[in-house]
Amino acid sequence: MHIGSSLALFWGAILLGYAARRARFVTLTFAPQMTRWLATWVAPPVALLAMWANEFTRLPVISLPFIGLAVSCASLAPAWWLMRRWRLSKPRAGSWLLSAFFSNVGFLGALVAFAVWGERAYGLCTLYFLFFGLGVYTVGYGIGDRYGASVPVESPGARQLELWRWTPMVGTLAGVALSWRGVPRPVVLTAINHALIPLMTAAYLFIVGTTMHMSRVGRFWREGLWMSAIMLVYAPLVGAALGAWWGYRHLPDPLVWRVVLLESAMPTAIT
């Protein structure tokens, strides 16, 4: 899989989903039901196999999720300043802050890494965005509680349970454990995961397309330009600085450093 085909898959799946919604081929319940099914049955084994293909014996590699979390938290600073300057109302303020915190490290970042550098890079990206699930149920819900409904709809304990039920967290940790113990991965699983990764990504992106409303994009051109500056200029500088400080540039395997640079330069998430 090459970079051109990965980008074609990315946009093609989104546009197909958007066309399906416009043609009313899917119902309102399709997106949440399909997302839950993929997160329960497909994402965990894909994460397990991708993580199993890597070597997690060095501390700097294990620290990747913390670098991802630090980059996302740092992106909140300029977003917060602009939110106060523009005096955004509560719902818009919450959406703005969440857009700054969550970047497209999964659907786009991991797919590009897989296309350019292979399955090991995909596994490192999976480790990098391990913070994503934790961020949803901590920072994400925290922003939602403050700028959305006045009363939280779930307790912190219930949210943590959802984290383990509906994300590839278990598969990720199982793959790290197998790699750490030095258990050899059967060769046949490589071909299986090489097929599952683009198929799963395409399915997720199709779901995203069924929830998009293109007519609303032009109304927020100012926010879009500033968010692009945060995600594509400011965040990569933060990621490069943190990665260099943590010693990624001097690791024998340059793939870790490349993954940090790639993932910190991703646009805002689209889910």
Where are these regions (language model features)?
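Alpha-helical transmembrane segments of multi-pass small-molecule/ion transporters
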Residues: 1-271
